[in-house]
Amino acid sequence: AWVLSHRGHAVANGLPVLSCNRVGHEASPLASDKHVGASGIDFWGNSHVLGPQGEFIAQAGSDPTVLVCEVDLQRSEQVRRIWPFLRDRRIDAYGDLLRRYID
């Protein structure tokens, strides 16, 4: 779900998305308390860079990695012309819609 939501954000905004995640186990400060039973959390890594159409430009694995890649910022302009998601926004209607919840 983590990667899928990032891909959706890239497509909806027509922008690259860079996502970082740690790797390894981080012990809980409560791990020493036998009554709590919290051992900690496992981080799976898989940091990634997505292009403006949600495609993978670079992806790290589950080992500690320095991920370096080039991102073509001009491509966002091209993609936004092909997929003009934001073109059909009705910003002028936002005030009336929000007033229902504010009042």
Regions found by a protein language model. Give the residues of each.
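A short, polar/charged loop-to-alpha-helix boundary motif
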Residues: P64-I82
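CN hydrolase (nitrilase-like) catalytic-core segments centered on the catalytic cysteine
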Residues: A1-L67
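A structural signal for well-ordered alpha-helical scaffolds and beta->alpha junctions
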Residues: W2-V3, D72, R90, L98
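Cysteine/selenocysteine-centered motifs that mediate thiol-based redox chemistry or coordinate metal-sulfur cofactors
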Residues: E77-D103
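Short, surface-exposed linear patches
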Residues: G8-N13, G40, V71-D72, R80, ...
